[in-house]
């Protein structure tokens, strides 16, 4: 029996509709949420990603700005662009599209963003607040997964969640979010990675399995507990197709599964917009 589809595209559309109503209320009060993107260099994929985020923002009534710097831009140039956006009261959310060209320090740039405008949730202050249980913004993919599981009524509380991947964007923040004493969370979390010995021994115990290691088809059917909910964060080009970290046969074992594309990706963008609206809501 094929797994139930965890339809991130449909859930994200519902979230955007909800946000549009709040954006309208904020705009009527003279505070239209606005997202600014800093784009450095001429990487084609980065331009595509920023364009898709801006279009999604505009569909929800969120204002969007784009600051483009050439590939020759220095660290000082990028930091100056961020400082200008920090000072602009009409901008509520700032994202710096990664990767930056070689020679630039993305950590210093991310740390320069005003924490109250850090809608990617990567500033040290926001990371610390997440760990403390008082989050302002959480990384968009991580919180998007939590929201998708909640809205698709996947039982998380009391479950064993296994995350494969320890990155700052997904694995580590997601472990904090899923283990939090909060509705839609309160799971026991095991955080694994590509260096974990006997990985399948952990994944086969998972009620909720998140594949976020960045390796195509790494999670095979034999590694999945029958009936488990599987979230595939992978996004890899294979010829003319996009594939994930989960092998195709997993759909015959899992109870629920996110598609690639159309699963986690739309949720990431939706939560970026949600964070932007939340930033505009701040006094």
Language-model segments: which ranges?
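N-terminal glycine-rich anion-binding loops that anchor highly charged ligand groups
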Residues: 25-35, 41-59
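Positively charged, low-complexity intrinsically disordered leader regions
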Residues: 1-31
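Short glycine-rich anion-binding loops that position phosphate/pyrophosphate groups of nucleotides
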Residues: 97-103, 169, 215-217, 235-236, ...
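Short beta-strand elements in bilobed, periplasmic/extracellular small-molecule ligand-binding domains
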Residues: 57-71, 185-191
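Short, well-structured alpha-helical segments in soluble
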Residues: 77-89
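Glycine-rich phosphate/diphosphate-binding loop of Rossmann-like nucleotide-binding domains
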Residues: 40, 45-54, 135-229, 238-251
